Amino acid sequence: MGMRMMFTVFLLVVLATTVVSFTSDSAFDSRNVAANDKVSDMIALTARRTCCSRPTCRMEYPELCGGRR
């Protein structure tokens, strides 16, 4: 193969890798959003349980435990 042909093959490989990487990142990002939502929900639930089990915290943040101010 000549130098020009090798350079063309190199460019095609780089382009193909870029396209595959870009589409994989988009799919990965949407999965990350769902995972981050689950983690946020778990953190909120843990904080709520911890706070509601302590009287001083429950009085300070009644909206977490279903109470009103």
Curated annotation (Swiss-Prot):
UniProt domain comment: The cysteine framework is I (CC-C-C). Alpha4/7 pattern.
BP term (GO), one: venom-mediated perturbation of G protein-coupled receptor signaling in another organism
Signal peptide: 1-21
Localization per record: Secreted
UniProt propeptide residues: 22-48
Modifications after synthesis and translation: Occurs in 2 forms which differ in the post-translational modification of Glu-60. In form SrA1 Glu-60 is 4-carboxyglutamate while in form SrA2 Glu-60 is unmodified.
Chain positions found as Glycine amide: G66
Cystine residue pairs: C51-C57, C52-C65
Name this polypeptide is given: Alpha-conotoxin SrIA/SrIB
Protein source organism: Conus spurius
Keywords carried by this UniProt record: Acetylcholine receptor inhibiting toxin, Amidation, Disulfide bond, Gamma-carboxyglutamic acid, Hydroxylation, Ion channel impairing toxin, Neurotoxin, Postsynaptic neurotoxin, Secreted, Signal, Toxin
Modification type 4-carboxyglutamate: residues: E60, E63
Lineage top rank: taxon: Eukaryota
Stored PROSITE patterns: ALPHA_CONOTOXIN
Family membership: Belongs to the conotoxin A superfamily.
Location of the region described as Ser-Xaa-Pro motif, crucial for potent interaction with nAChR in the Swiss-Prot/TrEMBL record: 53-55
Tissues in which the protein is found: Expressed by the venom duct.
Recorded GO MF terms: acetylcholine receptor inhibitor activity; ion channel regulator activity; toxin activity
InterPro entries, per the entry: Conotoxin_a-typ (IPR009958), Conotoxin_a-typ_CS (IPR018072)
Single GO cellular component term: extracellular region
Modified residues (4-hydroxyproline): P55
Chief subcellular location: secreted
Functional summary from the UniProt entry: Alpha-conotoxins act on postsynaptic membranes, they bind to the nicotinic acetylcholine receptors (nAChR) and thus inhibit them. Has weak blocking effects on muscle nAChR composed of alpha-1/beta-1/gamma/delta subunits and the central nervous system nAChR composed of alpha-4/beta-2 subunits. Does not detectably affect the peripheral nervous system nAChR composed of alpha-3/beta-4 subunits.
